[in-house]
Amino acid sequence: MTTLELDISKIRSVKGSRESFHREVDDMDFWDADWQLAKQLAVDVEISHEGKFLNMKGHLSTAVKGNCSRCLMQVTVPVESDFAEQLLYAKDVSLFSHLAVGEVEEKYFIYDNDTLDITDIIRESILAVLPQKVLCRDDCRGLCPKCGKNLNQGQCDCDLHEVDPRLAILAKLKETEEV
């Protein structure tokens, strides 16, 4: 798996300093086999030293591929996202003793050396902008629940009016009410 690492030693040593980075990645692990990069990931990052912490802001651009939630056909989703984080050196966490440990970790990305791995930040930024349910098209008809045929490619011969045996008694009740 490719990691996105930045050398921040120059920035850490001089308050008020600023540095820009550009990285490109061809693959990324999304913790979930449902998503893969379909296009090279381009990341532009600017980090500035702001006293007790570093400010990081950036932009990413890529496309990811996954499966349609209804018909399971492969779908490519373009992704553009801005992101921002405040970075806090692990040894400086004690300076924020007035905050609970959970609050510090919520507010800051904690790092512990001059090589900053932003892979998790980028991965989370991509996943945050992806739709909950990906469709190949808005009117996707999905798969036949009986035979599994992709209904976007034509109708199947299955009788979908067959009542689930567990609901048969309700169907009979409905029929008697209609009479």
Q: Which stretches of residues belong to each language-model region?
A:
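Structured interface patches
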Residues: 1-179
